[in-house]
Each structure stands twice: as C-alpha cells, then as structure tokens.
Amino acid sequence: MERVEDSQRATSDSAFNRMQLSTCRFGIKDNRITCAERPRIKSLESVGKNYGEDGKDSKNVTIVQEPAAERGVGMLSFSYDDTQRDNETWLYLSALGRVKRIASGNSDDDAEPASVFGSEFTTEDTDTGKLEEYEINILDETTESGREVWKIELIPNAQRALKSRYSRTVNYVDKERFVVLRVEMFDQYDNEIKRLLASRVELVNDIWMARSLTM
C-alpha cells in the first residue's frame, strides 16, 4: 500500500491532470453489480504539488469543467502525512463567488465526510497517507479486469474509526502497476455500501494512473 501511496503522490506532484468521475446507485442485475440509474459524470482538471519532509504532504486544486452548469466550481485540498494534523479542504462556489471550508470527517468526531462536487465520492475517499492508522492484511491473490492483483484489507484503528464511516475497505491492487483497480467499502455492520472501480489506466510520466473512476 505504501507503493500505491507513493504512486498517487507522484502523479499529482507538479502535474496537470484531467480525470472523469462517474457516480451512480448500484444494484444487482443478472447476478452482477451494475449501475441502477444513469451515471452522473463530471470532468475535472487538477494540479498539485508535494511538500514537507519526504514530499508526503500535498496541496491540490481541482476544477470542474463539465457539466457546464457546474463549470468553475473548485476544491482546494491540503493533505498531511502527520497523523496529528487533520487534512483540510475548501470548496469554491463559482456561481456565488464564495469559498466554503468543508468538513473532512477528521476535525470533528461527529462530522460526516463531505461529498466531493455533489458526487458519491467523499473527502474521506480522496484522502491519502496515514497508513499507520490502519491494520493492513493481504486476504488473497486474484484477478481484476484481467490483471493479477493483491486483495488487501484496511481496518481503521480505534482513533481512525472515530473519523471514518467505514469499518473496513478491501482494495484490489494491480501487482505490476501498483494501481488500485477496485475498492469495496463496508459499514459498521459489515455491509458493502460503496464500490469504486478504476479504468482507463495509462502511463503518465512513467507513473501508472487511472483516468476514470466510477463510484
């Protein structure tokens, strides 16, 4: 998982990226999990830079390009590797010309992580670093989208559990490219409540990254 984190940091460091977020409610059809509605798609552009000791802190700006009604809405995120520092996020509402600080789910034990651009992604889902706040277990070696992967479980420790809506996540990590291809997220009753699928994995500046994420 440290290799995955390092790759994620490298893709955002002093780099300009375009990405597509797709979100939908999922259901079961023909014994397969699939979208139960038309996906809501947002096209984003982002730029970031890593700071701090070993370059493990980061600052990132993300701007919505599509749909047109949301163009110009932006998000500024500061992520810290230090477990004693909470990550910080601000949202710029272009239609109102206002900046709003949004909850990360870290600064207040009772706060729900905020939605990212009105999608099923939350600030918790986009957090990086702080792997020491999790118990990490390799559950299996399998395949995902035709790729050999490790199936890795992350369970938050007592401190992190107070800030998380997930009791655990299961990550399918590409063995060769160190990209997470799928994440299953479970609630306190061990019910899967969300699933992330990554696609359009491309080599950018010698780093593999997913250009499309569906939640």
Question: Would you name each region that the model predicts?
Answer:
Residues 6, 21, 129-131, 161, ...:
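A generic signature of intrinsically disordered, low-complexity regions enriched in glycine/proline
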Residues 1-95:
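N-terminal mature ectodomain segment of secretory-pathway/periplasmic proteins
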Residues 45-52, 61-62, 104-108, 132-137, ...:
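Short, surface-exposed, charge-dense and proline/glycine-enriched linear segments
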Residues 61, 141-142, 168:
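Intrinsically disordered/low-complexity terminal segments and short unstructured peptides
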Residues 11, 56, 130, 146-148:
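A short, polar/charged loop/turn motif at coil->beta-strand junctions and beta-hairpin connectors
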Residues 6, 43-52, 135-143, 199-201:
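Short amphipathic beta-strand and strand-loop transition segments with alternating hydrophobic
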Residues 65, 76, 87-92, 98-127, ...:
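Gly/Pro-enriched, hydrophobic low-complexity segments
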Residues 118-137, 141-142:
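Surface-exposed beta-loop interaction hotspot
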